[in-house]
UniProtKB/Swiss-Prot annotation:
Belongs to the parvalbumin family. One of its GO terms (molecular function) is calcium ion binding. Residues 39-74, 78-109 form the EF-hand domain. Ca(2+) 2 binds at D91, D93, D95, K97, E102. This is Parvalbumin-7. PANTHER family: PARVALBUMIN ALPHA, PARVALBUMIN-7. The modification N-acetylalanine is found at A2. Transmembrane segments: none annotated. SMART domains: EFh. Keywords: Acetylation, Calcium, Metal-binding, Muscle protein, Repeat. It comes from Danio rerio (Zebrafish). Signal peptide: none annotated. Ca(2+) 1 binds at D52, D54, S56, F58, E60, E63.
Length: 109
């Protein structure tokens, strides 16, 4: 999986532990702690492809709910509130899903 090759296990664990409680997820802090912000745009796009479980070219709301599991099987599901907030922050064109460029822009904002 792309995550293991691009991100450090310790950083993934630290990030997941920090957002273990329901409704505690903050995408900006998560991206920073897990090490995504430090990655190049190309590597962030590889992470996107790993999170795009159905390979549709988009991360839809249902996939977004399980985004933490994409980093580790130990990750929890996002709550509906967290999922909607994450989607609203990333979905700049309002199509209800996150495209690869929207994801990369969100990580590096």
């Amino acid at each position: 999986m792309a995550m293991k090759n691009l991100l450090k296990d310790d950083d993934i664990k630290k990030a997941l532990d920090q957002f273990k409680a329901a409704d505690s997820f903050d995408h900006k802090k998560f991206f920073d702690v897990v090490g995504l912000k430090a990655l190049s745009a190309d590597n962030v796009k590889l992470v996107f492809k790993a999170l795009d479980v159905d390979a549709s070219g988009f991360i839809e709301e249902e996939e977004l709910k399980f985004v933490l599991k994409g980093f580790s099987a130990d990750g929890r599901d996002l709550t509906d509130k967290e999922t909607k907030a994450f989607l609203a922050a990333a979905d700049k064109d309002g199509d209800g899903k996150i495209g690869i460029d929207e994801f990369e822009a969100l990580v590096h904002e």
